[in-house]
Amino acid sequence: MTVIDEIYSSSSAIPTVALNDEAKKPVLGLGVAKLSDEETESSVLAALEAGCRLIDTAASYGNEAAVGRAIAASGIPREELFVTTKLGTSRQGFHSAQESCKESLDRLGLDYLDLYLIHWPAPTLGKYVESFEGMIEARERGHVRSIGVSNFTEDLLATVIEETNEVPAVNQVELHPRLNQAELRQVHAQHDVTTQSYSPLGVGRLIEEPTVTTIAAEYGRTPAQVLVRWNLQLDNVVVSRSSKPERVAENLDVFDFTLEPEHMEAIEGLHDGTRVLHDPMTFMGT
């Protein structure tokens, strides 16, 4: 039984984990990539109504303002929420990272971010280290409480740590049964970096995988719920996305069952290194 499992067994509410800076972060949340403003607002409201308190957006998604409107409409106190957004590649740099952070706050209608991430390392641009240093400054100024990275490999993460003497709180990466990121997760554990997974369903490609559907039938759950639960039992924070409010609530309803070790291993056996989204070493982002 994992540490997170022990927490799950006591409550159906979404638990939190402590980041390396002692901030508390919900282990499951809503992502809003590629959602229109209307879809974003309805999905965020549905998630908040279902008990979700982690909302993950990005400047490049173009829907930060919609996230902010939904948060305002919900009436939920700010201190109960954990809001993440990300620095776009076009704004990388020491000063521009700080400016972009404030611009995101303005669009969200918030006074501070809970977590600010470098969205893509864009290593050929060569600005990810100074960007992270700019985010450290933004944190010092109270604009953000925790800082981290997204789509960073083991080597890129090591470079940030070595050159800034700061360990990112989070590395958010594509992670699902086809790409389980086992080696990267080991590095994260060594440095006390929280692994946050996106695309836990493999962009929908895994919900019809026979291994997953068979296990889902045994538990009386949907394949999506099984995939999210598998990811959580690896001690990852997970963000999932849907434009349908009923699916949003369904994907959050995963805290009243536990996958048995043999089922975890069967799903683990699907790993073949397939990446369904961008290669972080070559993709530049926006």
UniProtKB/Swiss-Prot annotation:
List of catalytic residues: 61
Key words of the record: NADP, Oxidoreductase
Lineage: Bacteria, Bacillati, Actinomycetota, Actinomycetes, Mycobacteriales
GO molecular function, one term: aldo-keto reductase (NADPH) activity
Organism: Mycolicibacterium paratuberculosis (strain ATCC BAA-968 / K-10) (Mycobacterium paratuberculosis)
SUPFAM superfamilies tied to this protein: NAD(P)-linked oxidoreductase
Entry annotated with the keyword Mitochondrion: no
Domain of life (superkingdom): Bacteria
Alphabetical list of Pfam families matching this protein: Aldo_ket_red (PF00248)
Descriptive protein name: Aldo-keto reductase MAP_4149
Record keyword Cell wall biogenesis/degradation present: no
Listed EC numbers: 1.1.1.-
Residues binding NADPH: 201, 203, 239, 241-242, 247, 251
Protein family per UniProt: Belongs to the aldo/keto reductase family.
